[in-house]
From Swiss-Prot:
Protein name listed in UniProt: Cytochrome b
Its membrane topology: Multi-pass membrane protein
Lineage summary: Eukaryota, Metazoa, Chordata, Craniata, Vertebrata
Entry keyword set: Electron transport, Heme, Iron, Membrane, Metal-binding, Mitochondrion, Mitochondrion inner membrane, Respiratory chain, Transmembrane, Transmembrane helix, Transport, Ubiquinone
Gene name, Swiss-Prot/TrEMBL: MT-CYB
Principal location: mitochondrion
Superkingdom assignment: Eukaryota
Residues that bind heme b b566: H97, H196
Binding positions for heme b b562 per the UniProt entry: H83, H182
Organism: Sorex minutus (Eurasian pygmy shrew)
GO molecular function, one term: ubiquinol-cytochrome-c reductase activity
Cofactor(s), by name: heme b
Cell compartments where the protein resides: Mitochondrion inner membrane
Length: 379
């Protein structure tokens, strides 16, 4: 008798995706982040669902409904902080996942990579709208500043901003629609993640060497299921430690003050995972230029496959490219730090130099270095 998991229409899909999937035998722990992102998404959807049962998307009651969740709902504080810090874990895994893709040349799977970039945009949009919902000072002013950027678009800019606001300022209509979008987007992300996996399984996984692994495959279960479970346990350990010991360490104290349109906070800044993009935005004095740079800082990822000039896929055997990769990582950390600093000397010039270096590295220096390395190989 044939095994049910290989014949049943639904089980067959699960089987070919998570059980009998042929996987390269040499993939390292850097390949754990895909499954960790799946776990993060499930945690966010579940905690978000329970929060939505008690939250009210009205400017008069939003802030107090979050307070009510933390004070009066059974384990409401736990659900709220799991959701808030779960977002941070989500972005840590996302950045490491993208970094892995850049390091090992996984971007050569074009469809998978492009859907990944789309997923990154969707997660960033979801996180931004989620940050607005508690209706604290930073929620309100963050929403005002970021949505106002759209007014830089010629001709339709100001109309577009008012259309998004649903009025002449960030108000009840804005909060209600942000809540609606924040609720629906994670399900769209889950669907996109399914398509992401579909395209990945068309080609099979990449591996650290960047070479074809067709000659040496092992079944996903039990080898990588066990490996993924270890990753999940470590993720949960870090998340629970964060939630139970220092739940507010990544948040902003200003968000514990109810939103007040008449009082601007001294330093408006987004959550830590947007600071690198925020620093790039601020480093350009022109409004439209800043908005374009902000969008390009993420869109540039979609250009990476077309800038691949090396004969080797991975940079595992390319020392110069490795150095440049880690300079890029250091540059992004610098941008993240600058994004959280006030707009004054010397932070302005550091931010501008780091922004220029970011685009130069990806668009110019790394492709040229790849060609140079190939030529050095001929010597």
């Amino acid at each position: 008798m044939t095994n049910l998991r290989k014949t049943h229409p639904l089980m067959k899909i699960v089987n070919s995706s998570f059980i009998d999937l042929p996987a390269p035998s040499n993939i390292s722990s850097w390949w754990n982040f895909g499954s960790l992102l799946g776990v993060c998404l499930i945690i966010q959807i579940l905690t978000g669902l329970f929060l939505a049962m008690h939250y009210t998307s009205d400017t008069m009651t939003a802030f107090s409904s979050v307070t009510h969740i933390c004070r009066d709902v059974n384990y409401g504080w736990l659900i709220r902080y799991l959701h808030a810090n779960g977002a941070s874990m989500f972005f840590i895994c996302l950045f490491l996942h993208v970094g892995r893709g850049l390091y090992y040349g996984s971007y050569m799977y074009l469809e998978t990579w492009n859907i990944g970039v789309l997923l990154l945009f969707a997660v960033m949009a979801t996180a931004f709208m989620g940050y607005v919902l508690p209706w604290g000072q930073m929620s309100f002013w963050g929403a005002t500043v970021i949505t106002n950027l759209l007014s830089a678009i010629p001709y339709i800019g100001s109309d577009l901003v008012e259309w998004i606001w649903g009025g002449f300022s960030v108000d009840k209509a804005t909060l209600t629609r942000f809540f609606a979008f924040h609720f629906i987007l994670p399900f769209i992300i889950a669907a996109l993640a399914g398509v992401h996996l579909l395209f990945l399984h068309e080609t099979g996984s990449n591996n650290p060497s960047g070479l074809s692994s067709d000659a040496d495959k092992i079944p996903f279960h039990p080898y990588y299921t066990i490996k993924d479970i270890l990753g999940v346990l470590l993720l949960i350990l870090v998340l629970t430690s964060l939630v139970l010991f220092s739940p507010d360490v990544l948040g902003d104290p200003d968000n514990y003050t109810p939103a007040n349109p008449l009082n601007t906070p001294p330093h408006i800044k987004p959550e830590w995972y947007f600071l690198f993009a925020y620093a790039i935005l601020r480093s350009i004095p022109n409004k439209l230029g800043g908005v374009l740079a902000l969008v390009l800082s993420i869109v540039v990822l979609a250009l990476v496959p077309f800038l691949h000039t090396s004969k080797q896929r991975s940079i595992m055997f390319r020392p110069f490219s490795q150095c440049l990769f880690w300079i890029l990582v250091a540059d992004l950390l610098t941008l993240t730090w600058i994004g959280g600093q006030p707009v004054e000397h010397p932070f302005i010039i550091i931010g501008q130099l780091a922004s220029i270096l970011y685009f130069l590295l990806i668009l110019v220096i790394m492709p040229i270095t790849s060609v140079s390395e190939d030529n050095l190989m001929k010597w």
